[in-house]
């Protein structure tokens, strides 16, 4: 894959609610020239139907080849996006999904790599930080070419919540959620700003917002998935658009800074896990992490979040099957 290639090809693995919403976002936004959709054999006809349905929108958007794909179609793809996995049920945490989804992930990654794929993996199935790690292990790919959606959606939720609280456009809010995409994530309050004005200073000039309100706002962001799952069964629109944004950054070689699940090599005192932090991303994957200078409390939260993920990974990798399949 090179940044000068004009025909951009994406393979989507998993045509459930998230996958099909992502495909729809790609069509709406005119991203990529080719989209192949892979499903398990018993759901292949659904992928055929979705490809046909999506193709009927092309006269209103831009040309794109859309079809139900096989793993062999991954060989010349620029990007393989993995959304396939067991869904999160009411009452389940993302980490509860580990056992079911690691086995699914191993099967997918093995078949993609066997096709001769040389592009970039983008992982969205949950628990995303753990499955990004397993994709790296099972693929043998360089860490830069394995990316998780990380806290991209959480950060978008955070910005939207702050925007509503402050009555400003969310696009003018610059604030990140870091750590696990899940219960141990945290808000980087120390660097939240509105158009360059530190949040604390901005609040002084606008209105009297109590600390308790900000804590409640963050908790609403952290628990948003549970709220949505309890009301409609699943979340898919927000993450689909987040994935489309990451896809555009990769295919257009933007060198955009986005909060992603990124491999840690000592930043924040954390190593050997993929976890949510801002990073520069372009045509060759992760260019470099952007290491926000966290305060002491935030650094401790980052380390605690990573420790939880590491414990899950260590337990999972006691499975000899996963050990044998590891290439990194």
UniProtKB/Swiss-Prot annotation:
Q: CDD domains under this entry?
A: HicDH_like
Q: Where is substrate annotated to bind? A: 88, 94, 126-129, 154-157, 235
Query: What top-level branch of life does the organism fall under?
Result: Bacteria
Q: A single GO CC term, please?
A: cytoplasm
- Positions that bind NAD(+): 18, 39, 46, 71, 85-86, 107, 124-126, 149
- Where it mainly occurs, coarsely classed, is cytoplasm
Pathway-wise, it operates in: Fermentation; pyruvate fermentation to lactate; (S)-lactate from pyruvate: step 1/1
InterPro entries, per database record: L-lactate/malate_DH (IPR001557), L-lactate_DH (IPR011304), L-lactate_DH_AS (IPR018177), Lactate/malate_DH_C (IPR022383), Lactate/malate_DH_N (IPR001236), Lactate_DH/Glyco_Ohase_4_C (IPR015955), NAD(P)-bd_dom_sf (IPR036291)
> Phosphotyrosine occurs at which residues?
226
Q: Where does beta-D-fructose 1,6-bisphosphate bind?
A: 159, 174
Residues of the active site are 181 (proton acceptor)
Q: Which UniProt keywords apply?
A: Allosteric enzyme, Cytoplasm, NAD, Oxidoreductase, Phosphoprotein, Virulence
Q: Which reaction does it catalyse?
A: (S)-lactate + NAD(+) = pyruvate + NADH + H(+)
**Gene Ontology biological-process annotations:** glycolytic process; lactate metabolic process
- What are the protein's GO molecular function terms? L-lactate dehydrogenase activity
Activity control summary: Allosterically activated by fructose 1,6-bisphosphate (FBP).
Q: What is its EC number?
A: 1.1.1.27
Family classification: Belongs to the LDH/MDH superfamily. LDH family.
The record's function comment reads: Catalyzes the conversion of lactate to pyruvate. Plays a role in redox balance maintenance. May play a role in enhancing virulence in mice. May be considered a potential virulence factor.
Q: How does it assemble?
A: Homotetramer.
- Protein's name according to its UniProt entry: L-lactate dehydrogenase
**Gene behind the chain:** ldh
